[in-house]
Amino acid sequence: MSGESKDVAVVGAGVVGLSIAFHLAERGASVVVYERTGIGAGASGVQPGGVRRQWGTRVNCLLAAESLRWYADVRERLRMRVDPGFRACGYLFLAHSEGALAQLRRSVELQNGLGVPSRIVAPAEEAELVPDLRTEDLAGGAWCAEDGYFDRPQAIVEALGALADVRLHEVRSLAELEADAVVVAAGVDTPRLLPELPIRPEPRVLELSDPIRERLLEPLVVSAEHGFAAKQLADGRLLASGDRAALVDLLPRLVHVALPHRVEGVYDATPDHQAILGRVRDRVWVAAGFSGHGFMQAPAVGRILAEAILEGREDEALRVLDPARFAEGRLVPEPQIV
């Protein structure tokens, strides 16, 4: 069936579902997005807007790179009145042990082979990148200056929503949707419609300060071993997640910074912290389980699902991240989860 005559229903008006709807409509499909609460009402409404190409698996490197290229001119693509404000602050991944540094070396080698300008840095250079960073107990780290974040990521979600035919309706059964194809992109709620998929809620909390005039933390700093990530936004607010004690131990200048504002959300996590993409059965497709990196990959995922549904194309990501991998023992663990 051609794209011009195909009717597609998308369940979920988060950034992934809306991106899929955008790419389907761009290729001539008739698309309706069903959402039970509101545009960006789930994880897409609270995500901090980070975009990076530093990953430990080939599939994520490719999805992130394509998405970053798409985002480069997102304001023109979506006819946005508001500038979403991309800031290339850089991402610094810290390694506290030789084992963690060895994993970062493997990841950087993979990234470099795919055109990502990341590199391993010694503790002395980490101290230059992040003034006042305590490096005595660091083995090194990985750095990419081109990674960054959007000041207003929700503006992108809203712009995608404005271009879509979004209907507030709770889909209780896929049988009620009479479209030629159905895509379930409902994040943590996906198992309500596809209970066979191993997606579970993983609570996350973001803490924010009031605006601070002084720039205390310029790049985004991540410590997977100590369980935290932090950055300072363009408006001066400090944004942090995870272990505050570990954060101030590594960055003593932040010890007196209060973080009175809390934003609670959930990751739609899978056993390997990778998305589930592809056909589930007959006319039913899924794009969920992004484990916190849906915004970073949404543009590429939209293109891949649209081409698969309308043109029968099978992207590499559909082979790697297919729903059957869990039952078949083909998990693809991602080592660089924040």
Language-model-derived ranges and their functions:
Residues 143-174:
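Helical element adjacent to the flavin cofactor pocket in flavoenzyme catalytic cores
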